Amino acid sequence: MNDDLAIAQATKLKPIDEIAEFAGIERKYLKPYGNYIAKVSHRIYEELAQREDGNLILVTAITPTSAGEGKTTTSIGLSMALNRLGKKSFVTLREPSIGPVMGIKGGAAGGGYSQVLPMEDINLHFTGDIHAVSLAHNLLSAAIDAHLKFDNELEIDSTQIYWPRAMDMNDRALRKIVVGLGGKANGYPREDKFIITAASEIMAILCLAKDLEDLKERVGNIVIAKNKKKEYVLAKDLKVHGAIAALLKDAIDPNLVQTIEGTPAFIHGGPFANIAHGTNSIIATKIALKLSDYVVTEAGFGADLGGEKFLNFVSQVAGFKPSVVVLVASLRALKLHGGAKKDSITEENLEALEKGFVNLQVHYENLRKFGVPVLTALNVFPTDTDSEKKLFEKLCEKHGIPFGESRVWAKGGKGGEALAREVIKLAETHTSEYHPLYLMDTPIEEKLDILTREIYRAKGYELSPTAKAKLRSFKKNGFGNAPVIVAKTQYSISDNPKLLGAPKDYIFNIRDLNLSAGAGFVVAVSGDIMLMPGLGKEFGAQRIDIDKSGKISGLF
């Protein structure tokens, strides 16, 4: 079989006008970027608002291997399969961050015969949204240092500045820096750092805002520092929130592209799921729901990260009511959770598979707590043996877990038809009784207790002295009931990446709490979470090339 890029480049794309017409998007709302990409004005929602929503299908996964479980590929393939079965569908996904594309992860536009296209553009720059977020973020950084240099009327404490700088590249040398060197003309020296743009609060805001006015208000509410009286200083105190919103005036519009089979796709926004809420923009999904029978959307990493955040936080903010949750699993990941060595998970190992199945069980049970029908999708790999697949089926039947096989990587939409039929059956015969595990105004301590016990299966949690002090400050300043986004490892249900399978009855440690007042949540940090990745000894950029005709190679 050809590699992903060869398959993508061999596909004859439809003009974006045709994709928009099929989706029901009028030409007046389109801003084309070449022949195969277009921005869709977010204002189209005003015209569509009175229509009924289609069915929202959330795709999440078990605790993944470092290679991922294939959520994006499954999401794309499922949307194509639904279209093949006569259901008008849309897929809504996050935009890839260039840093990981150039690093170890590679591209993030699906794979095999289940891709969104044009994949080279999607993976490299796209419509410039991430660059716009970087500029907006760094305008605020520059404004802070300008204010410090010229009189500092807000009395900002230079040792209590929370706002870093941002760049969409993996660069470990920028994790800790000193700015303002070179004399008084360059400002005052202080410690600073860079984070990757996907980790910026502005990226989270872009994906949560309902319109430009809401976006501007949220940006204005970003807490950038404390002053010398220990009071919060906000972005609007520097009077740059209007300019930041202006920089994002096009970025707020969803990007329309197509799947390999011509299914409409929105690719918009890219917050990470282990440090933010981990799903594409609310605007894109809300528009798609008005245009389709079925919208397939993905939440990053496992069900304990992106899945939990979508169901507890994003759905409450947006007013979503998911119809079905699809839980993607692979035999190789289950074998890893059952004790198989990382370099041998492609080999048959029935004992490890049976032992590791408990990871799937826990995620399935957790998702059912939200009142939404859950379907497991077995992402089939060529190395899966018949004996392993039979054992998986037997275990699912034993524990009452409905499942369907996904072969979309190898067969495109046709390989997802069995899964799509099960999704349709669940959506049309089961009423979703969706409910979050906590309400928005629940105190932070109660939210943490619910999450650590119900999702992470801990017996409780413990706050570090730093986290306790910050919680007191949040309460004092009116943020004691803020929604909670837990930043933790993606490789375990717990806070320890080495605890595979289904750990339980441990203490979940929270070392820090960070306020994202503009986005509207508090981030509870557990363990070592990296906000600026680094390139490895060997990395993706070393494989990427371009010839004299402009044809790109090496992307995957």
UniProtKB/Swiss-Prot annotation:
GO terms for molecular function: ATP binding; formate-tetrahydrofolate ligase activity. Gene3D superfamilies: Domain 2, N(10)-formyltetrahydrofolate synthetase, Formyltetrahydrofolate synthetase, domain 3, P-loop containing nucleotide triphosphate hydrolases. Keywords: ATP-binding, Ligase, Nucleotide-binding, One-carbon metabolism. The keyword Glycoprotein does not apply. It catalyses: (6S)-5,6,7,8-tetrahydrofolate + formate + ATP = (6R)-10-formyltetrahydrofolate + ADP + phosphate. ATP binds at residues 65-72. It comes from the Bacteria. Pathway: One-carbon metabolism; tetrahydrofolate interconversion. Coiled coil: none annotated. GO terms for biological process: tetrahydrofolate interconversion. Pfam families: FTHFS. Its EC number is 6.3.4.3. Belongs to the formate--tetrahydrofolate ligase family. This is Formate--tetrahydrofolate ligase. The lineage of its organism: Bacteria, Thermotogati, Thermotogota, Thermotogae, Kosmotogales.
